[in-house]
Amino acid sequence: MSYQDILVFLDDGTTNATRVNTGFKLAKQHDASLTGIALATMKPRKVKTDSSMVRRRMSQEMAEKLVAEFTSQAADKGVNSKTIIIAGDADESTLKLTHYSHNYDLLILRQPNPDHENYSRLTQLSETVLLKSGRPILFMPYIGTDKCPGERVMITWDGTASACRAVHNAIPILQHAKEVVLVIVENDKT
């Protein structure tokens, strides 16, 4: 069992390069296609403006820059790639990202850095995709990114069919893990 389609989240955070390189490595390892996805709804870091029109334009430009860099790197590394830019408000873009995630074998997301200007937005986005995608997610930490991803794996389990599918779909990562931690989420369904 291997992955055919991998989705990696692109942003202007300090861990973007590590996350993208992990995506390239996994795509090569599994002979998979790698899709880079950027949100044109994120306020670029260090931008100070109250104008929503300026913020939207700068967000779109940032997303275009991220996908251009990703496309160039993918070509240099010989990785089959695609890109997606999601526009819309915060809730709409989160919903779109969740829907896109259903089409991929593995998602590579980031743990939000509390020092990032978009921390609350990234937290909401990550939590929603994590809980609603039903897909295995390689959740890259904002610290310790020099460690080999996939050695320590956490499975969140709530007893649902989507949790079962996600665990089954994560078998290619689980086979190589040195440690697997199971977190059971109890609710009225379990």
Where are these regions (language model features)?
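A structural preference for short, hydrophobic beta-strand core positions in alpha/beta folds
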Residues: 36, 83-85, 139, 182
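Gly/Ser-rich helix-loop-strand patches that form or flank binding pockets
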Residues: 16, 20-28, 96-145
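Generic structural signal for helix capping and beta-alpha/helix-loop junctions
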Residues: 44, 91-93, 116, 147
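A conditional alpha-helix N-cap/helix-loop micro-motif detector
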Residues: 16, 63, 87-90, 119, ...
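Structural beta-alpha unit
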Residues: 1, 72-107
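N-terminal positively charged helical leader segments and presequences
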Residues: 33, 48-87
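Short, small-residue-enriched loops and turns at beta-alpha junctions
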Residues: 88-91, 115-116, 187-190
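Small/aliphatic-rich secondary-structure junction motif
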Residues: 1-53, 132, 149-190
